[in-house]
């Protein structure tokens, strides 16, 4: 099943745009409206599974929190394990962490040290690609554990915020179903 223009337009139309959220001047792309539409949600998962079904993926990693909503069903569809990457203090076993920059300050992500094995071929999944900082930190965690990651998949790409280019510099090919301008 290759995505048709009609299917991609359906997905795009299922994502509501909220003006001035979370602050004035921002046009927020609300993927939760896609989740409310079972046809759109299933289609988004099916299209990602179809794209990666023959890629030799052994693990899917999803970033907190909306990456879980797409990553886990993609992992099931591919017949592989799902690994959550979370904010500090949310994972019960031994973890490693990676700090990354935000617009105003820094944040941190963690992964269980035993979640990725050396040689695992990992697909990173998240709901949205903006600047790429969260995904870059996630990729660093996976690589520190010996995993191989060359691809990241998203529902939405805010194409003018530089995320694709940032990931390209890390050797990551990004794929998204729905492009939107970031402003």
Curated annotation (Swiss-Prot):
Q: Sorted alphabetically, which keywords does the UniProt record give?
A: Cytoplasm, Glycosyltransferase, Purine salvage, Transferase
Q: Does the keyword Glycosyltransferase apply?
A: yes
Q: Which GO terms describe its cellular component?
A: cytoplasm
Where would you say this protein principally sits, based on its record?
cytoplasm
Which Gene Ontology terms describe the biological processes this protein takes part in?
A: adenine salvage; AMP salvage; purine ribonucleoside salvage
Main enzyme class: transferase
Catalytic activity entry: AMP + diphosphate = 5-phospho-alpha-D-ribose 1-diphosphate + adenine
Its EC number(s): 2.4.2.7
Q: Which domain of life is it from?
A: Bacteria
Which SUPFAM superfamilies does UniProt cross-reference here?
PRTase-like
Kindly give the Pfam families that the UniProt entry links to this protein: Pribosyltran (PF00156)
Q: Which GO terms describe its molecular function?
A: adenine binding; adenine phosphoribosyltransferase activity; AMP binding
Quote the function comment for this protein. Catalyzes a salvage reaction resulting in the formation of AMP, that is energically less costly than de novo synthesis.
For this chain, the family text in UniProt reads: Belongs to the purine/pyrimidine phosphoribosyltransferase family.
Cited PANTHER family: ADENINE PHOSPHORIBOSYLTRANSFERASE (PTHR32315:SF3)
- Tell me how this protein assembles: Homodimer.
Quote the protein name from its UniProt record: Adenine phosphoribosyltransferase
Name the source organism. Escherichia fergusonii (strain ATCC 35469 / DSM 13698 / CCUG 18766 / IAM 14443 / JCM 21226 / LMG 7866 / NBRC 102419 / NCTC 12128 / CDC 0568-73)
**Gene name?**
apt
């Amino acid at each position: 099943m290759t995505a048709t223009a009609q299917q991609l337009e359906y997905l795009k139309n299922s994502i509501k745009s909220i003006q001035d959220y979370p602050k004035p001047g921002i046009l927020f792309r609300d993927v939760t409206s896609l989740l409310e539409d079972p046809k759109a949600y299933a289609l988004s998962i099916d299209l990602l599974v179809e794209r990666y079904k023959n890629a030799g993926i052994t693990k899917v990693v999803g970033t907190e929190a909306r990456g879980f909503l797409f990553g886990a069903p993609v992992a099931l569809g591919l017949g592989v394990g799902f690994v959550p990457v979370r904010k500090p203090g949310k994972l019960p076993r031994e973890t490693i962490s990676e700090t990354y920059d935000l617009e105003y300050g820094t944040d941190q992500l963690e992964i269980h040290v035993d979640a990725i094995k050396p040689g695992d071929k990992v697909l990173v999944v998240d709901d949205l690609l903006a600047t790429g900082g969260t995904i870059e930190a996630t990729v660093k965690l996976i690589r520190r554990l010996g995993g191989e990651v060359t691809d990241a998949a998203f529902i939405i790409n805010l194409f003018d915020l530089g995320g694709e280019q940032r990931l390209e510099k890390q050797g990551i090919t990004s794929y998204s179903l729905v492009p939107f301008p970031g402003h």
